[in-house]
Amino acid sequence: MARDEFPGWHGTTIIGVKKGGEVVIAGDGQVSLGQTVIKGTARKVRRLSPGGFDVVAGFAGSTADAFTLLERLEAKLEATPGQLARASVELAKDWRTDKYLQKLEAMLIVSDGKDIFVITGAGDVLEPEHDVTAIGSGGNYALAAARGMMDSPRSAEEVARDAMAIAADICVYTNGNLTVETISA
């Protein structure tokens, strides 16, 4: 089968919600190959602690590529302790300019409890305007749902869980088996 004909790994939904002095990153557990669900219990949200500095990261895209990027992010955080923004920018620069990294197909949401960023292979480090961001195939559904709940009395975790439930109901590449990590500044 030629590379262009390979159906590829599809879908996931990752959301980051900053509210009430904490950040919650949640992700579903579904991994699909074409129209087939391969696994329903994948962990796409991880807690990293390079040099004792806690960061939560969620990823969408190729798992192997995401792990490569998470390792690079950990190295950047060790080189710039406590400076998530700087480490994220350094990772994005490497990702955009390194010939090997340019081929990686993944996106990351990262947070240290104070800041939350989306890091892309295009060299972007984006901080959400409305304290909520989402990536992946169900990202737009989760983002819209969460934005509609941000003024409610729900906690960051409740907003994230409810938004993910809505995304899982709409997006066939997203399931309701969530991994949720909370981090405070």
Swiss-Prot record:
CDD domains attached to this UniProt entry: protease_HslV (cd01913)
Catalytic-site annotation from UniProt: 12
Organism: Roseobacter denitrificans (strain ATCC 33942 / OCh 114) (Erythrobacter sp. (strain OCh 114))
InterPro entries in the cross-refs: ATP-dep_Prtase_HsIV_su (IPR022281), Ntn_hydrolases_N (IPR029055), Proteasome_sua/b (IPR001353), Proteasome_suB-type (IPR023333)
An example Gene Ontology biological process: proteolysis involved in protein catabolic process
Enzyme Commission no: 3.4.25.2
Chain's gene name: hslV
Gene3D superfamilies documented for this protein: Glutamine Phosphoribosylpyrophosphate, subunit 1, domain 1
Name used for this protein in its record: ATP-dependent protease subunit HslV
